[in-house]
Design a protein with these regions (language model features):
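Short-chain dehydrogenase/reductase
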Residues: 24, 49, 53, 133-137
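Rossmann-fold NAD(P)-binding glycine/threonine-rich loop
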Residues: 2-6, 11-39
Length: 186
């Protein structure tokens, strides 16, 4: 975008092809160059990240003097009528679900194994109760920078049992890996 002089907009952050990791620092490094070029770069303009950041800003502006704890809970245990269905790009979804969890606690990011923290969450208005798993999601990085009173920030997501079983099978046969696999010596 810088080379062609056009504005930049994304719904999720950059993920390298060969590394199962994502973070905003790679994109934030371009901020000064975009400003000097008079160009806009809007990162994370989807739902999470995106709407979750807007909701947090709205609450901070209109309802709270300070926010100390923030839990973002993405409840969608649907199956779309298929045995295995993701609600986002399947490759990216599998990467983020199988990656180490990072959450913000007492001024720093803490790392725990993927899917190691499970809780139960009851949605309002008879939607139901869901098992949710703490996982890393990129908006945590921008939220703790822009809301410095946060002492804890966590992201949680629900998954249907069929999804979890299929993910386990894919992992067991090596299909959640991103490294190259040789077949017949190639």
């Amino acid at each position: 975008c810088l080379a062609t002089g056009v504005n930049y907009l994304d719904t999720a952050n950059y993920e390298p092809l060969d590394t199962a990791k994502f973070e905003y620092s790679w994109q934030w490094a371009y901020q000064e160059r975009f400003q000097q070029a008079g160009l806009m770069a809007l990162l994370g303009s989807g739902f999470d990240p995106g709407a979750t950041n807007v909701f947090t800003a709205y609450l901070a502006k209109h309802y709270f003097d300070e926010i100390h704890e923030l839990d973002i809970i993405d409840v969608n245990g649907g199956d779309h009528g298929y045995p295995f269905a993701t609600n986002f790009n399947p490759e990216i979804n599998i990467r983020e679900v199988t990656a180490e969890c990072r959450h913000f606690e007492n001024g720093e990011f803490v790392t725990t194994p993927a899917m190691s923290t499970k809780a139960s969450f009851t949605c309002p208005e008879e939607v139901g109760t869901y098992s949710i798993y703490r996982m890393y999601h990129e908006e945590l990085e921008s939220l703790v920078v822009n809301f410095p009173t946060l002492k804890r920030a966590q992201f949680w997501m629900s998954f249907g049992e069929s999804y979890l079983k299929h993910l386990e099978v894919l992992g067991n046969v090596g299909m959640t890996r991103i490294d190259e696999v040789e077949f017949q010596g190639q």
